[in-house]
Amino acid sequence: MKIIIPNINDKVHYIEDKQSIVLLGANGAGKTRMSVWIDENNPELNIHRISAQKSLNMPEYVRPTELRRAEDNFLYGTTYNDRDWLKSAGKKYNRWGDEPEIHMLNDFQPLMEFLMTENFEKSIEYRENHKDGNQEFDNETKLEKIKKIWEKVITHRKLIVCAGKIEVESKEGNTEKYNGNMMSDGERAIFHYIAEVVSAKDKS
Protein backbone atom coordinates (compact mmCIF):
# COMPACT_ATOMS: atom_id res chain seq x y z
CA MET A 1 0.00 0.00 0.00
CA LYS A 2 1.29 3.46 -0.96
CA ILE A 3 -0.24 6.48 0.80
CA ILE A 4 0.31 10.03 -0.40
CA ILE A 5 0.87 12.49 2.46
CA PRO A 6 1.02 16.32 2.30
CA ASN A 7 4.03 17.79 0.51
CA ILE A 8 7.08 18.67 2.56
CA ASN A 9 9.23 21.48 1.13
CA ASP A 10 7.28 21.22 -2.15
CA LYS A 11 8.25 17.56 -2.54
CA VAL A 12 5.74 14.71 -2.84
CA HIS A 13 6.07 12.16 -0.04
CA TYR A 14 4.60 8.70 0.45
CA ILE A 15 4.22 6.19 3.24
CA GLU A 16 4.64 2.67 1.89
CA ASP A 17 4.09 -0.87 3.18
CA LYS A 18 3.06 0.08 6.71
CA GLN A 19 0.33 -1.81 8.56
CA SER A 20 -0.22 0.95 11.11
CA ILE A 21 0.41 4.69 11.12
CA VAL A 22 0.13 6.71 14.34
CA LEU A 23 -0.20 10.50 14.24
CA LEU A 24 0.99 12.20 17.43
CA GLY A 25 0.37 15.85 18.26
CA ALA A 26 -1.14 18.28 20.72
CA ASN A 27 -4.77 19.37 20.55
CA GLY A 28 -5.20 21.56 17.49
CA ALA A 29 -1.98 20.36 15.86
CA GLY A 30 -3.86 19.12 12.79
CA LYS A 31 -4.17 15.34 13.21
CA THR A 32 -7.80 15.26 12.06
CA ARG A 33 -7.16 17.61 9.14
CA MET A 34 -4.23 15.46 8.01
CA SER A 35 -6.38 12.32 8.12
CA VAL A 36 -9.05 14.12 6.06
CA TRP A 37 -6.36 15.22 3.58
CA ILE A 38 -5.13 11.62 3.26
CA ASP A 39 -8.72 10.43 2.72
CA GLU A 40 -9.43 12.99 -0.01
CA ASN A 41 -6.10 12.68 -1.83
CA ASN A 42 -5.83 8.89 -2.08
CA PRO A 43 -8.97 8.02 -4.11
CA GLU A 44 -7.59 4.67 -5.27
CA LEU A 45 -7.45 3.38 -1.67
CA ASN A 46 -10.30 2.17 0.53
CA ILE A 47 -10.10 4.59 3.45
CA HIS A 48 -12.57 4.30 6.32
CA ARG A 49 -12.29 7.09 8.89
CA ILE A 50 -13.94 6.91 12.32
CA SER A 51 -14.45 10.31 13.88
CA ALA A 52 -13.74 10.92 17.57
CA GLN A 53 -16.89 13.08 17.52
CA LYS A 54 -19.72 10.61 17.03
CA SER A 55 -23.19 9.72 18.19
CA LEU A 56 -23.46 6.43 20.05
CA ASN A 57 -27.25 6.13 19.85
CA MET A 58 -27.73 2.48 18.92
CA PRO A 59 -31.08 1.83 17.22
CA GLU A 60 -33.53 -0.37 19.10
CA TYR A 61 -34.62 -2.23 15.94
CA VAL A 62 -33.49 -2.24 12.31
CA ARG A 63 -34.75 -3.88 9.13
CA PRO A 64 -32.55 -5.63 6.57
CA THR A 65 -32.44 -4.15 3.09
CA GLU A 66 -30.54 -4.89 -0.14
CA LEU A 67 -26.92 -5.73 0.73
CA ARG A 68 -25.04 -3.36 -1.58
CA ARG A 69 -27.36 -0.48 -0.68
CA ALA A 70 -26.85 -1.18 3.02
CA GLU A 71 -23.07 -1.28 2.67
CA ASP A 72 -23.01 1.94 0.61
CA ASN A 73 -25.18 3.77 3.12
CA PHE A 74 -22.82 2.72 5.90
CA LEU A 75 -19.55 3.50 4.10
CA TYR A 76 -20.58 6.62 2.19
CA GLY A 77 -23.87 7.84 3.67
CA THR A 78 -25.70 7.25 0.38
CA THR A 79 -25.71 4.94 -2.64
CA TYR A 80 -25.08 5.63 -6.33
CA ASN A 81 -23.97 3.74 -9.44
CA ASP A 82 -20.98 6.04 -10.06
CA ARG A 83 -18.51 4.45 -7.63
CA ASP A 84 -15.81 7.10 -8.13
CA TRP A 85 -18.28 9.87 -7.21
CA LEU A 86 -19.54 7.81 -4.29
CA LYS A 87 -16.06 7.37 -2.78
CA SER A 88 -15.19 11.06 -3.12
CA ALA A 89 -17.93 13.69 -3.25
CA GLY A 90 -20.68 11.30 -2.20
CA LYS A 91 -18.88 10.34 1.00
CA LYS A 92 -17.83 13.91 1.76
CA TYR A 93 -21.32 15.38 1.40
CA ASN A 94 -23.35 12.54 2.90
CA ARG A 95 -21.26 10.67 5.49
CA TRP A 96 -19.43 13.83 6.55
CA GLY A 97 -22.04 16.54 5.94
CA ASP A 98 -19.58 18.51 3.74
CA GLU A 99 -17.59 19.26 6.93
CA PRO A 100 -15.28 16.24 7.29
CA GLU A 101 -13.00 17.95 9.82
CA ILE A 102 -15.72 18.83 12.35
CA HIS A 103 -18.87 16.85 11.49
CA MET A 104 -20.26 14.63 14.26
CA LEU A 105 -20.43 11.13 12.82
CA ASN A 106 -23.87 9.57 13.20
CA ASP A 107 -23.72 6.18 11.49
CA PHE A 108 -24.97 3.67 14.07
CA GLN A 109 -28.27 3.20 12.19
CA PRO A 110 -26.71 2.42 8.76
CA LEU A 111 -24.01 0.36 10.47
CA MET A 112 -26.61 -1.85 12.16
CA GLU A 113 -28.69 -2.07 8.96
CA PHE A 114 -25.61 -3.29 7.08
CA LEU A 115 -24.76 -5.84 9.78
CA MET A 116 -28.31 -7.17 9.98
CA THR A 117 -28.62 -7.35 6.19
CA GLU A 118 -25.33 -9.23 5.84
CA ASN A 119 -26.38 -11.56 8.66
CA PHE A 120 -29.73 -12.21 6.92
CA GLU A 121 -28.10 -12.87 3.52
CA LYS A 122 -25.56 -15.29 4.98
CA SER A 123 -28.28 -17.07 6.97
CA ILE A 124 -30.12 -17.77 3.71
CA GLU A 125 -26.87 -18.92 2.06
CA TYR A 126 -26.09 -21.20 5.02
CA ARG A 127 -29.59 -22.72 4.99
CA GLU A 128 -29.54 -23.36 1.23
CA ASN A 129 -26.13 -25.05 1.37
CA HIS A 130 -27.16 -27.29 4.25
CA LYS A 131 -30.44 -28.18 2.52
CA ASP A 132 -28.33 -29.29 -0.46
CA GLY A 133 -26.35 -31.60 1.83
CA ASN A 134 -23.21 -29.49 2.21
CA GLN A 135 -22.85 -29.99 5.96
CA GLU A 136 -19.27 -28.66 5.99
CA PHE A 137 -20.27 -25.25 4.63
CA ASP A 138 -19.75 -22.33 7.00
CA ASN A 139 -19.90 -18.57 6.43
CA GLU A 140 -19.22 -16.60 9.60
CA THR A 141 -21.06 -13.30 9.63
CA LYS A 142 -19.70 -9.93 10.66
CA LEU A 143 -22.05 -9.92 13.66
CA GLU A 144 -20.63 -13.26 14.79
CA LYS A 145 -17.10 -11.85 14.58
CA ILE A 146 -18.13 -8.72 16.49
CA LYS A 147 -19.84 -10.83 19.16
CA LYS A 148 -16.69 -12.94 19.69
CA ILE A 149 -14.42 -9.90 20.05
CA TRP A 150 -16.85 -7.90 22.20
CA GLU A 151 -17.32 -10.80 24.62
CA LYS A 152 -13.54 -11.12 25.02
CA VAL A 153 -13.42 -7.46 26.08
CA ILE A 154 -16.64 -7.36 28.13
CA THR A 155 -16.18 -10.68 29.87
CA HIS A 156 -19.28 -10.60 32.13
CA ARG A 157 -21.83 -10.00 29.36
CA LYS A 158 -22.86 -11.81 26.19
CA LEU A 159 -24.55 -10.58 23.03
CA ILE A 160 -27.56 -12.33 21.53
CA VAL A 161 -28.18 -11.71 17.83
CA CYS A 162 -31.92 -11.67 17.12
CA ALA A 163 -34.00 -10.73 14.09
CA GLY A 164 -33.55 -6.97 13.71
CA LYS A 165 -31.97 -6.34 17.09
CA ILE A 166 -29.15 -7.09 19.50
CA GLU A 167 -29.85 -8.20 23.05
CA VAL A 168 -27.50 -8.38 26.02
CA GLU A 169 -27.50 -10.58 29.10
CA SER A 170 -25.23 -11.46 31.98
CA LYS A 171 -23.08 -14.57 31.50
CA GLU A 172 -24.08 -15.59 35.03
CA GLY A 173 -27.74 -15.48 34.02
CA ASN A 174 -28.71 -13.39 37.04
CA THR A 175 -30.22 -10.48 35.11
CA GLU A 176 -32.92 -10.17 32.48
CA LYS A 177 -32.02 -9.69 28.83
CA TYR A 178 -32.19 -6.13 27.56
CA ASN A 179 -32.00 -4.41 24.18
CA GLY A 180 -28.57 -3.40 22.93
CA ASN A 181 -29.55 0.26 22.90
CA MET A 182 -29.59 0.06 26.72
CA MET A 183 -25.92 -0.89 26.95
CA SER A 184 -23.68 1.42 28.94
CA ASP A 185 -21.79 4.16 27.10
CA GLY A 186 -18.59 2.13 27.33
CA GLU A 187 -20.20 -1.07 26.08
CA ARG A 188 -21.75 0.75 23.12
CA ALA A 189 -18.49 2.54 22.31
CA ILE A 190 -16.59 -0.76 22.30
CA PHE A 191 -19.26 -2.37 20.10
CA HIS A 192 -19.16 0.60 17.71
CA TYR A 193 -15.36 0.58 17.28
CA ILE A 194 -15.24 -3.19 16.75
CA ALA A 195 -18.15 -3.07 14.30
CA GLU A 196 -16.64 -0.18 12.31
CA VAL A 197 -13.36 -2.06 11.84
CA VAL A 198 -14.99 -5.42 11.04
CA SER A 199 -17.37 -3.73 8.55
CA ALA A 200 -14.75 -1.71 6.68
CA LYS A 201 -13.77 -3.03 3.25
CA ASP A 202 -10.87 -5.47 3.04
CA LYS A 203 -7.45 -3.79 2.85
CA SER A 204 -8.86 -0.46 4.03
What positions do the PLM features span?
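Hydrophobic anchor at the beta1->P-loop junction of P-loop NTPases
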Residues: L23
